[in-house]
């Protein structure tokens, strides 16, 4: 089973490579309404003072 994650424009998605079993969205903390990055990832990154990550593990959940 391979996960499908949305690209930055959610009309498009990609099939994740093996081992990358999470979808993620990355936001700037200053603007939490517009994601700056979306895609596949293996481990959810830690949030920082500037950047917030939202990760999930179902198809196109990002």
UniProtKB/Swiss-Prot annotation:
The keyword Secreted applies. CDD domains: TFP_snake_toxin. GO terms for biological process: killing of cells of another organism. GO terms for molecular function: toxin activity. Disulfide bonds join 5-23, 16-40, 44-55, 56-61. One of its GO terms (cellular component) is membrane. InterPro entries: Cytotoxin_Cobra, Snake_3FTx, Snake_toxin-like_sf, Snake_toxin_con_site, Toxin_cobra-type. The keyword Membrane applies. Keywords: Cardiotoxin, Cytolysis, Disulfide bond, Membrane, Secreted, Signal, Target cell membrane, Target membrane, Toxin. Expressed by the venom gland. Residues 1-2 form the signal peptide. It is found in: Secreted; Target cell membrane. Monomer in solution; Homodimer and oligomer in the presence of negatively charged lipids forming a pore with a size ranging between 20 and 30 Angstroms. Belongs to the three-finger toxin family. Short-chain subfamily. Type IA cytotoxin sub-subfamily. Shows cytolytic activity on many different cells by forming pore in lipid membranes. In vivo, increases heart rate or kills the animal by cardiac arrest. In addition, it binds to heparin with high affinity, interacts with Kv channel-interacting protein 1 (KCNIP1) in a calcium-independent manner, and binds to integrin alpha-V/beta-3 (ITGAV/ITGB3) with moderate affinity. This is Cytotoxin 6. It comes from Naja sputatrix.
